[in-house]
C-alpha cells in the first residue's frame, strides 16, 4: 500500500483501538496528568497488571523496535498508549499549529485525530529527500535526529559540565529521558538522519521553540519522562526483551555516536526498499530510514543528495573508528558495517543427537582457556580498563578514595560492593564472587542487585566516574560490567578465563526486573550446574591439580546419568574431539584466539633501519656489517617460506587433504608489501632481518597451533574456521612481502600444500591447483561418478563448519566435487553405482587420561615420585594420554629401535607428532587407525639419538643441550637448512662438542657447525655410556624420564648434566628426580679468551675454566661421580680429543672425517708422493713454506703425517675467579700468562686437559720439537685472516716427554673461590 494509505490505516486502528482512552485523556487530561506525576508513570506497575503485551506491528510506537524512543516493551498497555498518544501530539503540534485540548465526540473525527493525521502526512513529506540548494538553521535542526546518549569521550568533546548528582535510578531515568527528548529537547522529525556525506562535527545547540511549543512540552513532559524512563529501565535491565536488540542501539552510548550514524545510515533506505519490494512488511529498517512503505511495483526511491565531501581523515583514525564500530555492533543490534538489522532465526534441526545430548557432548569452539580473546589485552600504562573493548580511563592509584577502599577490601575478606582496578588483582574479586555464588543461603543475587555500600564506596565510584571524563552518569552506556561489584569483563577476556563469565551472567540476571525471586533462584541453580565443570577444569589447570570426576557434571549423583550413556553410545570415545573436558591438553595460546593474535603480531611487526644506517658492531661474526645482515635475512626468508609450507600442509591435513575445503584459500592472494612508516627510510622486507625473525617466530607458532588444533579436531568448528582464515592471511602477507625476492625453487615439492605456498610466493592464482586436487579426489573417490546434475555444488552458506562434525564441503572451483554426506534430492533417482561413503575424519592420537587409571602400555607422562631437580609439567601434560593400540601402531617402525620405543611411550607429545606425520588410513575399513608413517628427513634426524647407545641400560651419563638454529648432531649441514649464526653470547652444539673434544671452537674451525658437511662422529662417547640429548630431539622429555625410571628400577643412579639455559628449557620439560646426580651448567663461547678478549693475542689458545661452565670443571665433577657410582666400570674420559670427529670439506674431498689418523692420512696422500705433488691437491700443504697449523688444526704435510689431518692443538685452561675475569686480561699476569703465551700443546687424542690453577702450576711451557734435521725448526701457525706466526725456533731431535696432568680431585678439594663448586 502507499504511504498515505498505510498512515490512514494506522490512524483508523488507533482510533478504534484507543477511542476510550483518548476521549478520557481529552476530557480529564489534567487529572490524568496529575495522577501520572504523582504515581511516577508506568515505571511502577500495579501488582494487578498483567505481563507486557506482544507488540502490535500496526501500532506506531511498537512498530519502531529500533528507533530508540521506547527502549523496551511497555509494562502497562494503557499507560503506554497514553504515552504514545502524547508523543504523537507533541510531533503533531509543530505541523498543525492548533491546540490539542479540544474534546472529541464519539463517532466523529476529532480535531486531535486530524492533527495526528496531519503530523503523519507532514512527516512523510519531510522525510522524502529533496535537493534544496541551502537550508536555514531551523530546517537544519528539524532534519536532525535526536541525539542519543554519548560515550564519556564524546561528552568530553561536547564540553558538557559534569553534575555531581548521585548515581541512582531517578537520575539515570531523568538523563535517559532528557537524551530521548533531544538536547534542550525539540521533537525532531522521526526517521531523519544526518546527511551521510556531511562533516562529522558536533551539533550546534538547538534553537529555542516558540512559546506554545514550550507550553505543550511542559504539559506533556512528566508523562514522556515516565515513558522514557520505563524504556531505559527495561532496555538496560533485560537484554532479552523483544525490542532490546534494536532499542539498545539507540540508547547505548557506545553504540550510537554521530560518527557512526553519519557513515552507515545512508545505506538503510536502499536496503529497506529492496526488502520491501521482495515482499517483506515494513520493519525496523524501513521505519529507521524514515521512508514510507511502497508497493512492490513502485518506482525506486530517489537517492539522497550528495553534500560537500567530508574532510580527509588519517588512516589510523579511520581504521580505529571502524574497528570500534564493529566491536559495538553486537551490542547495538547492528551488522558488521553498523547498519541496524533485525535478527532472523535460522532453521534449527532437532535430531536424535540433540535430544540425547550427544550433539552437546561433541561441542567444540576451537578456543583454549588461558589464551586472550581476540582484540582483548591489558590497558596502556597508567590506565585501567573502562568502557567497551579496548577503551580505558586514567588510573586512580594514590588517590585517597582508592587507597581507603583498597585497605578496606584487603581487610574484609569479602568481595567489594564497588570494585575498581585500583583495588588490586581482578582475579581475587572474581574468585570471591564466584565462591559467593556457590555458597548456599548467601543471598548472592540480592547482593549483586543491591549491595550495602559504605560512604567510601560511594566516594570511590564517584571518583572513578569523574576521572573517566563522562558528563552525566547514564545507565545506558557500555561500562564493561552490569554491576559495580563485578570487575570489567576485559580482564576475563585478556586472561582467557571463560569461568569468570559466571559473575557477569549472574549479575545480569540479578539486575533484571523481568524475573521474580523464585525465577532468579532457578536461573542461579542453572548457572551453577552449567559453570561447575568449566570452573573445575580451569582452576585445576591453574593449580596443577587433577580434575575430579573427569571434569564431568558435578550433579551426576542425582539420577541424570542419561547425560553420559547416549553420548557414549553416539560419540567416538577415543577421539579427543568427542570430549570437551580435555581443552587444557593444549598449552594456553595454541588455539583459535592464539592464531588470531599471532596474525596481529605479524601484521604489526615494525620495520627496522637499513643495514648501512645501523650499528657497525656486527662485523665480529661470519661476514661483516650489512653483508652479514643481508645474508642472514636471506636465510630467514627461506625459513619463512618453509614455515608457510608447513602452515598450508597442516591446514590440508586438517581438511583431509582437500585444499579446496580450507576456508579462505581459494581466494587467497599475496598481500601488498608493507609500506615504510613515516619515521623514515626502512629496509625492504626481504632484507629486514629483525622483522623477518619476528615473522618466522609467529609463522612457526601458527604452524604448531594448527597442528595441535588438527589433532584435537578443532579445525572444523567455528573458531577453527577463523583460525584457518587467519593462517591463510598470514601466509598471504608474508608471500606478498618476500615473494618477489625469493629464488624459484627448482625441486619437486612433496605435497600440494607446499605447491600452494610456492604459488602464493610467486603471485599466482591457486584456483588451477585447487581444481586439479579436487579432480584427483573425484577420480579416486568415485570412478563411476554420479551425473553432473546430481553432484553440482551451489551453496551460498558462509565459511562455517557444518553441524555434527561432518567433513567440510569444498569451496567453489572449476571442477566438480562430491558433496560430503549429502543425500540426493527427493525427486532425483540415485545413481546406479552407489558412491562410497565419505572418508571418516582422522582419529586423534591424544585423549584425556581415563578415570580408572592409565593403561601400562599406553602413552602418558610417568612423572617420577618425590622431589625433583627440574620443574614439574603442567596438569594438561600429565592428563594427555594415548591409547595402547595407538601407541603400538605409531611406534612399530624400523626407524625406532625396539629398546628405545618405551621412550616414545613416555612422551604423549612425541606420539602426537608421529600421528601428524602418518598418512590417512586406507579405505575399506582397515583395522589400523593410522596410515603408514612418513619417515621424512626431519623425523629421521629427530630420532637419530636412539642410535648413539644401542641399549638404554648402558647409559650412565645424559648430557642435555639446546642447539643453535642450524645445528644438528644427526645431519650436520646435510639437512639442507640455513647455516647457523655464530654467537659469542650463547653456545650450542658446536661449543659443547669442542669442550668434550678438548679443543677450541671458532667460526673458521672444523668444530663450528657452519663448516660441517655431515653428522659428527660421537661414537666414542656412546661407547662410554654418554648420551647427548637435544631439546629438539623426538621424545626429549620422555627419554629423560624413561632413563631415570629405568636406572631406578636397576637400583642405580643416573648422572644428568643439564647444559640448557633456563630461557631455552622447553615447556613441560622432563622431570629429573633428586635420587639421581644432577649438574646444571651453561655452554658459553666467551670462556675462550680469543672470543672474550680478542685483542690479547698471547691468550688466544687459553680457555677460562669454571665449575659452572661446560668444560673441565664440570667434567671433573662428572668423572668423580661416575667413579663413585660405578666403581667397576672403566673411568670416564670426557675432555679428550678422540671423543669427537667432524665431517668437513678438506683437500681430500667434501666429506672428510677429521681429525684423520696419521695412517689414514698417509694412505690418502700416497698418490701425490710420486714427484708430482705440486700439481696435486696436496701441493700447498707439501710446499716448503706451508703452515703447520691453520686455525690451530694440522695442515702441512709434516704435521699431518705426524698427528693426522685436522688434528687440533690443545688449549690451556686457566682457573680464574669471577672478579679477575671481570677485571680483564690484565688480571692474568706473571708466570701463568707467560706460560699461556708460549705453550704449544701438540695434538693428542688421549691427553687430559691441562689446567693452571695458580702460578705454581706454570712450569716451563711445552713446545713442539721437530725431529727433521733438514726441515724447519719452528712451528708455523696461520690464521684464517692471513696472519702467520712462527713459534719455537730451537731445533731438537725428539719431542720432550709430556707434562703430567694436574690431579683434578686434589684441585676440587682446594677450590676455595667456588670455581668448581656447586
Swiss-Prot record:
Post-translational modification: ADP-ribosylated. The long stretch of Ser is a major site of phosphorylation. Only the phosphorylated forms are capable of interacting with beta or gamma genes.
Compositionally biased intervals (Basic residues): 1-11, 206-226
Subcellular localization, as worded in the UniProt entry: Host nucleus; Host cytoplasm; Virion tegument
Molecular function as annotated in GO: DNA binding
Stretches with biased composition (Acidic residues): 74-91, 159-174, 1303-1318
Pro residues compositional bias, start-end: 44-56, 299-308, 799-808, 821-843
The keyword Lyase belongs to this UniProt entry's keyword annotation: no
Keyword Transcription regulation in annotation: yes
Region (Disordered): 1-108, 123-324, 542-580, 606-630, 780-873, 1291-1318
Low complexity bias locations: 228-257, 268-278, 309-320, 566-580, 844-863
Location (main, coarse): host cell
Bias (Basic and acidic residues) ranges: 133-143, 547-564
A Pfam family hit: Herpes_ICP4_N
DNA-binding span(s): 319-547
Record keywords: Activator, ADP-ribosylation, DNA-binding, Early protein, Host cytoplasm, Host nucleus, Phosphoprotein, Transcription, Transcription regulation, Virion, Virion tegument
GO CC annotations on file: host cell cytoplasm; host cell nucleus; viral tegument
Covalent S-S links between cysteines: none
GO biological process, one term: positive regulation of DNA-templated transcription
Notes on the domains: The N-terminal and C-terminal domains are required for the transcriptional activation function of ICP4.
Sequence similarity: Belongs to the herpesviridae ICP4 family.
Purpose: Plays an essential role in the regulation of viral gene expression by both activating and repressing host RNA polymerase II-mediated transcription. Binds with high affinity to the sequence 5'-ATCGTC-3'. Activates transcription by recruiting a form of the host TFIID to promoters and stabilizing the pre-initiation complex formation. Negatively regulates its own transcription. This immediate early (IE) protein is absolutely necessary for the transition from IE transcription to later viral gene transcription.
Subunit structure as annotated in this protein's UniProt entry: Homodimer. Interacts with transcriptional regulator ICP27; this interaction is required for proper incorporation of ICP4 into virions. Interacts with host TBP; theis interaction helps the stabilization of the pre-initiation complex on specific promoters. Interacts with host GTF2B.
Designated name of the protein: Major viral transcription factor ICP4 homolog
Native species: Human herpesvirus 2 (strain HG52)
Lineage: Viruses, Duplodnaviria, Heunggongvirae, Peploviricota, Herviviricetes
Amino acid at each position: 500500500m502507499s504511504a498515505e494509505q498505510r498512515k490512514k490505516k494506522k490512524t483508523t486502528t488507533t482510533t478504534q483501538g484507543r477511542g476510550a482512552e483518548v476521549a478520557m485523556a481529552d476530557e480529564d487530561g489534567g487529572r490524568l496528568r496529575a495522577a501520572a506525576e504523582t504515581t511516577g508513570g508506568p515505571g511502577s506497575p500495579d501488582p494487578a497488571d498483567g505481563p507486557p503485551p506482544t507488540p502490535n506491528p500496526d501500532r506506531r510506537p511498537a512498530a519502531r523496535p529500533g528507533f530508540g524512543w521506547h527502549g523496551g516493551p511497555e509494562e502497562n498497555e494503557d499507560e503506554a498508549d497514553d504515552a504514545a498518544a502524547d508523543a504523537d501530539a507533541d510531533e503533531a503540534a509543530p505541523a498543525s499549529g492548533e491546540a490539542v485540548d479540544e474534546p472529541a465526540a464519539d463517532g466523529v473525527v476529532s480535531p486531535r485525530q486530524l492533527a495526528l493525521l496531519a503530523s503523519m502526512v507532514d512527516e512523510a513529506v519531510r522525510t522524502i529527500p529533496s535537493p534544496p540548494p541551502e537550508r536555514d538553521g531551523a530546517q537544519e535542526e528539524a532534519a536532525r535526529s535526536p541525539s542519543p546518549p554519548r560515550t564519556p569521550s564524546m561528552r568530553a568533546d561536547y564540553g558538557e559540565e559534569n553534575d555531581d548528582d548521585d548515581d541512582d535510578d531517578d537520575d539515570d531515568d531523568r538523563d535517559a529521558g532528557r537524551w530521548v527528548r533531544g538536547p534542550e529537547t525539540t521533537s525532531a522529525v522521526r526517521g531523519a538522519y544526518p546527511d551521510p556525506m556531511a562533516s562529522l562535527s558536533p551539533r550546534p545547540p538547538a534553537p529555542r521553540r516558540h512559546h506554545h511549543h514550550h507550553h505543550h512540552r511542559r504539559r506533556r513532559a512528566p508523562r514522556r519522562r515516565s515513558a522514557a524512563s520505563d524504556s531505559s529501565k527495561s532496555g538496560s535491565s533485560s537484554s532479552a526483551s523483544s525490542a532490546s536488540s534494536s532499542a539498545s542501539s539507540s540508547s547505548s552510548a557506545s553504540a550510537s555516536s554521530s560518527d557512526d550514524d553519519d557513515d552507515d545510515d545512508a545505506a538503510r533506505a536502499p536496503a529497506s526498499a529492496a526488502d520491501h519490494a521482495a515482499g517483506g512488511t515494513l520493519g525496523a529498517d524501513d521505519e529507521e530510514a524514515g521512508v514510507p512503505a511502497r508497493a512492490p511495483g513502485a518506482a525506486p526511491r530517489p537517492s539522497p543528495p550528495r553534500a560537500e565531501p567530508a574532510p580527509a581523515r588519517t588512516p589510523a583514525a579511520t581504521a580505529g573508528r571502524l574497528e570500534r564500530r564493529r566491536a559495538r555492533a553486537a551490542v547495538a543490534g547492528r551488522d558488521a558495517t553498523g547498519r541496524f538489522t533485525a535478527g532472523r532465526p535460522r532453521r534449527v534441526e532437532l535430531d536424535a543427537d540433540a535430544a540425547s545430548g550427544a550433539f552437546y557432548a561433541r561441542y567444540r569452539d576451537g578456543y583454549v582457556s588461558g589464551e586472550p580473546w581476540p582484540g582483548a589485552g591489558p590497558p596502556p600504562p597508567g590506565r585501567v580498563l573502562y568502557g567497551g573493548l579496548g577503551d580505558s580511563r586514567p588510573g586512580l592509584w594514590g588517590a585517597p578514595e582508592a587507597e581507603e577502599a583498597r585497605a578496606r577490601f584487603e581487610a574484609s575478606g569479602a568481595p567489594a560492593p564497588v570494585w575498581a582496578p585500583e583495588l588490586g588483582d581482578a582475579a581475587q574479586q572474581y574468585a570471591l564472587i564466584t565462591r559467593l555464588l556457590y555458597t548456599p543461603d548467601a543471598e548472592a543475587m540480592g547482593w549483586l542487585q543491591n549491595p550495602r555500600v559504605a560512604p567510601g564506596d560511594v566516594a570511590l565510584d564517584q571518583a572513578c566516574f569523574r576521572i573517566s571524563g563522562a558528563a552525566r552518569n547514564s545507565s545506558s552506556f557500555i561500562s564493561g560490567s552490569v554491576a559495580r561489584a563485578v570487575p570489567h569483563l576485559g580482564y576475563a577476556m585478556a586472561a582467557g578465563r571463560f569461568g569468570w563469565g559466571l559473575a557477569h551472567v549472574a549479575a545480569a540476571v540479578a539486575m533484571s526486573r523481568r524475573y521474580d525471586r523464585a525465577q532468579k533462584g532457578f536461573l542461579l541453580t542453572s548457572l551453577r550446574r552449567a559453570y561447575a565443570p568449566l570452573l573445575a577444569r580451569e582452576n585445576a589447570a591453574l593449580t596443577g591439580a587433577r580434575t575430579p570426576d573427569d571434569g564431568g557434571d558435578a550433579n551426576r549423583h542425582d539420577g541424570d546419568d542419561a547425560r553420559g550413556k547416549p553420548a557414549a553410545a553416539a560419540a567416538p570415545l577415543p577421539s579427543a574431539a568427542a570430549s570437551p573436558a580435555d581443552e587444557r591438553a593444549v598449552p594456553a595460546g595454541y588455539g583459535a584466539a592464539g592464531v588470531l593474535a599471532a596474525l596481529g603480531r605479524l601484521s604489526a611487526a615494525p620495520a627496522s633501519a637499513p643495514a648501512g644506517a645501523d650499528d657497525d658492531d656486527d662485523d665480529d661474526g661470519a661476514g661483516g656489517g650489512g653483508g652479514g645482515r643481508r645474508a642472514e635475512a636471506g636465510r630467514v626468508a627461506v625459513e619463512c617460506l618453509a614455515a608457510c609450507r608447513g602452515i598450508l600442509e597442516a591446514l590440508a591435513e586438517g581438511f583431509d587433504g582437500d585444499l579446496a575445503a580450507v576456508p579462505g584459500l581459494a581466494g587467497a592472494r599475496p598481500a601488498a608489501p608493507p609500506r615504510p612508516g613515516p619515521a623514515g627510510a626502512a629496509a625492504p622486507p626481504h632484507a629486514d632481518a629483525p622483522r623477518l625473525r619476528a615473522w618466522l617466530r609467529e609463522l612457526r607458532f601458527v604452524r604448531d597451533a594448527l597442528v595441535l588444533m588438527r589433532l584435537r579436531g578443532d579445525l572444523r568448528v567455528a573458531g577453527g574456521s577463523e583460525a584457518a582464515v587467519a593462517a591463510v592471511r598470514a601466509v598471504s602477507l608474508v608471500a606478498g612481502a618476500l615473494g618477489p625476492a625469493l629464488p624459484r625453487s627448482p625441486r619437486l615439492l612433496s605435497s600440494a600444500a607446499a605447491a600452494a605456498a610456492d604459488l602464493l610466493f610467486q603471485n599466482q592464482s591457486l584456483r588451477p591447483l585447487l581444481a586439479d586436487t579436487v579432480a584427483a579426489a573425484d577420480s579416486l573417490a568415485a570412478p563411476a561418478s554420479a551425473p553432473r546434475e546430481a553432484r553440482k555444488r551451489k551453496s551460498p552458506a558462509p565459511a562455517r563448519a557444518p553441524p555434527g562434525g561432518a567433513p567440510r564441503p569444498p569451496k567453489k572451483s572449476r571442477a566438480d566435487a562430491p558433496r560430503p554426506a549429502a543425500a540426493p534430492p527427493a525427486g532425483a533417482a540415485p545413481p546406479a553405482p552407489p558412491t562410497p561413503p565419505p572418508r571418516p575424519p582422522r582419529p586423534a592420537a591424544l585423549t584425556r587420561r581415563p578415570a580408572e587409571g592409565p593403561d601400562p602400555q599406553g602413552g602418558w607422562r610417568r612423572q617420577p615420585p618425590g622431589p625433583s631437580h627440574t620443574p614439574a609439567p603442567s596438569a594438561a601434560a600429565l592428563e594427555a594420554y594415548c591409547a595402547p593400540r595407538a601407541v603400538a601402531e605409531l611406534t612399530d617402525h624400523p626407524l625406532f629401535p625396539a629398546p628405545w620405543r618405551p621412550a616414545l611411550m613416555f612422551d604423549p607429545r612425541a606420539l602426537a607428532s608421529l600421528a601428524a606425520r602418518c598418512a590417512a588410513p586406507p579405505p575399506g575399513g582397515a583395522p589400523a587407525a593410522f596410515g603408514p608413517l612418513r619417515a621424512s628427513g626431519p623425523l629421521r634426524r629427530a630420532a637419530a639419538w636412539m642410535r648413539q647407545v644401542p641399549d638404554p641400560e648402558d647409559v650412565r651419563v645424559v648430557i642435555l643441550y639446546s642447539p643453535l638454529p642450524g645445528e644438528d648432531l644427526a645431519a650436520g649441514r646435510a639437512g639442507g637448512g640455513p647455516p647457523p649464526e655464530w654467537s659469542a653470547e650463547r653456545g650450542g652444539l658446536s661449543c659443547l662438542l669442542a669442550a668434550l673434544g678438548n679443543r677450541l671452537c671458532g667460526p673458521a674451525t672444523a668444530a663450528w657447525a657452519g663448516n660441517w658437511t655431515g653428522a659428527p662422529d660421537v661414537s666414542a662417547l656412546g661407547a662410554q655410556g654418554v648420551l647427548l640429548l637435544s631439546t629438539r630431539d623426538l621424545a626429549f622429555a620422555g627419554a629423560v624420564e624413561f632413563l631415570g625410571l629405568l636406572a631406578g628400577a636397576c637400583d642405580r643412579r643416573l648422572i644428568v648434566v643439564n647444559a640448557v639455559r633456563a630461557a631455552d628449557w622447553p615447556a613441560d620439560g622432563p622431570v629429573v628426580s633428586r635420587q639421581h646426580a644432577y649438574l646444571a651448567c651453561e655452554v658459553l663461547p666467551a670462556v675462550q679468551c680469543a672470543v672474550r678478549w680478542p685483542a690479547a693475542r698471547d691468550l688466544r689458545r687459553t680457555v677460562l675454566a669454571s665449575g659452572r661452565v661446560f668444560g673441565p670443571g664440570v667434567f671433573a665433577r662428572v668423572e668423580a661421580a661416575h667413579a663413585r657410582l660405578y666403581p667397576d666400570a672403566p673411568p670416564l674420559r670426557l675432555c679428550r680429543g678422540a671423543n669427537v670427529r667432524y665431517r668437513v670439506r678438506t683437500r681430500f674431498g667434501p666429506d672428510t672425517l677429521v681429525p684423520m689418523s696419521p695412517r689414514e692420512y698417509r694412505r690418502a696422500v700416497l698418490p701425490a708422493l710420486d714427484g708430482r705433488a705440486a700439481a696435486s691437491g696436496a701441493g700447498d700443504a707439501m710446499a716448503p713454506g706451508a703452515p703447520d697449523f691453520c686455525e690451530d688444526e694440522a695442515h702441512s704435510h709434516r704435521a699431518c703425517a705426524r698427528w693426522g689431518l685436522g688434528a687440533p692443538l690443545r688449549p690451556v685452561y686457566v682457573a680464574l675467579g669471577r672478579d679477575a675475569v671481570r677485571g680483564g686480561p690484565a688480571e692474568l699476569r706473571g708466570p701463568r700468562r707467560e706460560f699461556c703465551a708460549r705453550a704449544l700443546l701438540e695434538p693428542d687424542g688421549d691427553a687430559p686437559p691441562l689446567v693452571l690453577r695458580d702460578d705454581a702450576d706454570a712450569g716451563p711451557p711445552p713446545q713442539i720439537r721437530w725431529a727433521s734435521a733438514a726441515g724447519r725448526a719452528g712451528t708455523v701457525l696461520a690464521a684464517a685472516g692471513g696472519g702467520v706466526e712462527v713459534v719455537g725456533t730451537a731445533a731438537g731431535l725428539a719431542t720432550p716427554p709430556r707434562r703430567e696432568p694436574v690431579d683434578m680431585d686434589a684441585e676440587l678439594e682446594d677450590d676455595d673461590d667456588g670455581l668448581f663448586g656447586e
